[in-house]
Amino acid sequence: MYLTIPLEIYLKLNYFLKQFPTTEWSGPAWYKPHYRKGEKFPKGFTLVHFHPVDLGHGTATTIEAGDTARILQKTWKDYPETEKCMMGIIHSHHNMGAFFSGTDKNCLKDNAPIQNFYCSTVVASKKEKFAFAISYQDQYGKTHLIESKSEDINMQMPNKSKEQDK
């Protein structure tokens, strides 16, 4: 299961990580699924958009349903591609490294949909930079959680200029 992070999103992630180096933040995120022809299980996703709605503290952040509801209409208007995406979450672990804690895994399990998939991305400014996972319920109501390997998270990086080397 892969995740692609486009350059524009990568730059936005870095901005928030630099602005809040010791504080966790979170918000809804929209993911475009990618399928092999004729298959219903995605081979990967692209992180299309995210909107931080909560600035937590050093060890936690919380998203309330009302926070997400308030931004949905504007998000769909400003980013029409999000209407065809699956919604999930993104949050930071600032300088602790990106990984799925027990709380993060419970969030994935609690939000596993009966149809489609719930995606979650964790980002960090130190150590492991990205972690990605999905959850879903199968036809028998059993919840599944799939974590991507770090090498399956692809960032579209900016071209390094001579100015950046100085």
Indicate where each model-derived feature is located.
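Conserved beta-strand-loop surface patch within small alpha/beta domains used
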Residues: M1-M87, N95-K166
